UniProtKB/Swiss-Prot annotation:
GO MF annotation list: ATP binding; ATP hydrolysis activity; RNA binding; RNA helicase activity
Reactions performed catalytically: ATP + H2O = ADP + phosphate + H(+)
Enzyme type, top EC level: hydrolase
Binding site for ATP: G185, G186, T187, G188, V189, G190, K191, T192
Subcellular location: Virion
Protein name, as recorded: RNA helicase NPH-II
Helicase ATP-binding domain: residues covered: 172-347
Pfam families: DEAD, Helicase_C, NPH-II
Induction: Expressed both early and late in the viral replicative cycle.
Organism: Vaccinia virus (strain Ankara)
């Protein structure tokens, strides 16, 4: 469906597009093309104003029940009006008078083609659209947006590239085409903060109709923005809620979905056309109940995110529109061209609002000498922060590879620098509180973070990035630090330059950067289980295909050996994380154990009941050797004795030397086996 977005339906960015009500005199002076633009108003008017409406007679005038109160009456016969009263907005016949809107209400019946609308119908649609506040113009003021979506406060002023008229037209054409859309743009153009809002607007106006060429029945479904982490769900939903002029969730078009969501974050009066901010896990549980699917941070290749892409592609007829958003297609463009059916690629040009300066700090040690390289890096970091210091009241972000390094670098910096130090990563629960301290402090704040802060979170007062250029890539029973890819570098650099000019200080040679194929270092059971649930053909229906298919097939055989029915697996998938697939054997035993185990997976709280249950699974590891690392850490070289990776070597750190065997509780907790 090729359809351009008329100017009158632009989303009000409150910069050069404002909410606007058109007069009948303005309509009279318009060209035919401009007048015809109002024909598309029939779709939002049918959904949001005329649904369940009827004809009434009010003071002798036929009107729609949404215009005035009155007794329900049979509609009059309609021919060409004898006279038009532009002031009263009425068509006058010899025997009756009818409002412009009521005339249109009676004429706009199912299967009527919109290009058949005459001037009389269009005038009524203009009035109905004015009442809904769905029109816009290049002149106006912010306060005109109050009430557009039931909001008590005006929309935010947004100068970002994604809400320019040009970008709005391009995004609308792609959305209405029902083709899968891959949307890229420089960090800071408003992909995460504005494009979902724009798609919400299009969904509010036109979502649920099979075509915009004629009037049909509609099936209204919300938009969903699927995100890899709960913190992102909370942050982005709050940003868009405020920018749409709301202060509370109830009654707004914004809803949140994630596990163990608190009562105060549940929208008890959601809108059918609204937007749901959800974790990937919960997006999959009701994927086909949404009309427009937006998957953000595609470049991260979050496992469940990649599975959603595979499922949506396999069942694309069940979704009206799919948007994949990423800062860069450095690693994925060719795969997406082949994988998606006839995709549309949209790039929103633009850069951060403010200039970003780059500074390279050379590390004279070769990274193959890991410990010496890191020690030199820490010394360089102190020097760099002293030379390139955020102003008072501002902050800098230090990107390191892992949670352990966050604590290591924070401890090192605190002894040498007089600034406020904070740690933020995916397991930190009080991020909002930390950010409030950062924003309210008159001092310099230094935030040490994992790659967690790469993703879309805009810290308002950050002026400096100090990038170590590494990421920890988890692998079954271990993992390794790798140098980042170009897309990760772009994300980190783009954390500054949004609110103020910024400085990006990097401590790694650019030649070290490389693409990271995450699926080759992941447990693969989710791919198997969701493939079974959604009838995916393996491996060809996967977005990213593992290099070693033997592991995929061994995983399938291992899952089959559990003797758990497909129906039960589907229930487990919908309700539990199952970070270790063996936990499934415990989840099916009893509801009480399932509740405690689920709490352990979510919070890390390990009760004796859960520990004993996991120990009963006999997830045994043989200790081959060990060596002393430092005062309270010993490195143990081990062999896995269970599951898909039986026989695989693993390295495990423990606070004292061990021999014999240990049992695995989780990917980070191990219990020595008593040799007596």
């Amino acid at each position: 469906m090729e359809k351009n977005l008329p100017d009158i339906f632009f989303f009000p960015n409150c910069v050069n597009v404002f909410s606007y009500k058109y007069s009948q005199d303005e309509f009279s002076n318009m060209s035919k093309t401009e007048r015809d633009s109002f024909s598309l108003a029939v779709f939002p008017v049918i959904k949001h104003r005329w649904h369940n409406a009827h004809v009434v007679k009010h003071k002798g005038i036929y009107k729609v029940s949404t215009e005035a109160r009155g007794k329900k009456v049979s509609p009059p016969s309609l021919g060409k009006p004898a006279h038009i009263n532009l002031t009263a907005k009425q068509y006058i016949y010899s025997e009756h008078t009818i409002s412009f809107e009521c005339y249109s209400f009676l004429k706009c019946i199912t299967n009527t083609e919109i290009n058949s609308f005459d001037e009389y119908i269009l005038r009524g649609l203009l009035e109905a659209g004015n009442s809904l506040q769905i029109f816009s113009n290049s002149v106006g003021k912010r306060t005109d947006t109050i009430g557009v979506l039931g909001n008590k406060y005006p929309f935010s002023k947004i100068p970002l590239a994604s809400l320019t008229p040009k970008a709005q037209r391009e995004i609308f054409s792609a959305w209405i085409s029902h083709r899968p859309v891959v949307l890229t743009g420089g960090t800071g153009v408003g992909k995460t903060s504005q494009v979902p809002k724009l798609l919400l607007w299009f969904n509010y106006l036109f979502g649920g109709f099979s075509t915009l060429d004629k009037i049909t029945d509609f099936h209204e479904r919300p938009v969903i923005l699927s995100l890899p982490r709960i913190a992102l769900v909370r942050l982005h939903s709050n940003t868009i809620l405020k920018s749409l002029g709301f202060k509370v969730l109830d009654g707004s078009p914004i809803s949140l979905r994630y596990g163990s969501i608190p009562e105060e974050l549940i929208n008890k009066q959601p809108k059918k056309y609204g937007i749901v901010f959800s974790t990937h896990k919960l997006s999959l549980t009701k994927l086909f109940s949404y009309g427009t699917l937006i998957i953000d941070e595609v470049h991260e290749h979050d496992q469940i995110g990649d599975i959603i892409i595979a499922v949506a592609r396999k069942h694309h007829t069940k979704i009206d529109s799919m948007f994949l958003m990423t800062a860069t297609l450095e690693d994925d463009r060719e795969r997406l061209k082949v994988f998606l059916p006839n995709p549309a690629f949209i790039h929103i040009p633009g850069d951060t609002l403010f200039k970003i300066s780059e500074v390279f700090i050379h590390n004279k040690i070769n990274p193959s000498s890991r410990m010496a390289y890191i020690e030199e890096e820490k010394r360089n970091l102190v020097t760099a922060i002293q030379m390139y210091t955020p102003p008072d009241g501002s902050s800098g972000i230090v990107f390191v590879a892992s949670v352990a390094q966050c604590h290591e670098y924070k401890s090192y910096l605190e002894k040498r620098l007089p600034y406020d130090m904070y740690i933020i990563h995916g397991k930190v629960l009080d991020i909002d509180e930390i950010l409030e301290k950062v924003y309210s402090s008159p001092n310099v704040s230094i935030i040490i973070s994992t790659p967690y802060l790469e993703s879309s979170v805009t810290i308002r007062n950050v002026t400096h990035i100090y990038d170590m250029g590494r990421v920890f890539v988890p692998a079954p029973f271990g993992g390794s630090q790798e140098f980042i890819s170009k897309s990760m570098r772009d994300q980190r650099k783009g954390r500054v330059g949004r609110v103020n000019p910024g400085t990006y200080v990097y401590f790694y040679d650019l030649s070290y950067m490389k693409s990271i194929q995450r699926i080759d270092s992941e447990f693969l059971h989710n791919y198997i289980l969701y493939a079974n649930k959604f009838n995916l053909t393996l491996p060809e229906d996967l977005f990213i295909i593992p290099t070693n298919l033997d592991i995929l097939w061994r995983t399938k055989e291992y899952i089959d050996s559990f003797d758990i029915s497909t129906e039960t697996w589907n229930k487990l998938l919908s309700n539990y994380y199952m970070k270790m697939i063996e936990y499934a054997k415990l989840y099916v035993l009893s509801p009480i154990l399932a509740e405690e185990l689920d709490n352990f997976e979510r919070t890390g709280e390990l009760t004796s009941i859960v520990q004993e249950a996991i120990l009963s699974l006999n997830l045994r590891i043989k200790i081959l050797n060990f060596k002393h690392k430092d005062d309270d850490t010993y490195i143990h070289f081990c062999k896995i004795l269970f599951g898909v990776y039986n026989g695989t070597n693993a390295t495990i750190y423990y606070h004292r030397p061990l021999t014999g065997y240990m049992n695995m509780i989780s990917d980070t907790i191990f219990v020595p086996v008593d040799n007596n």
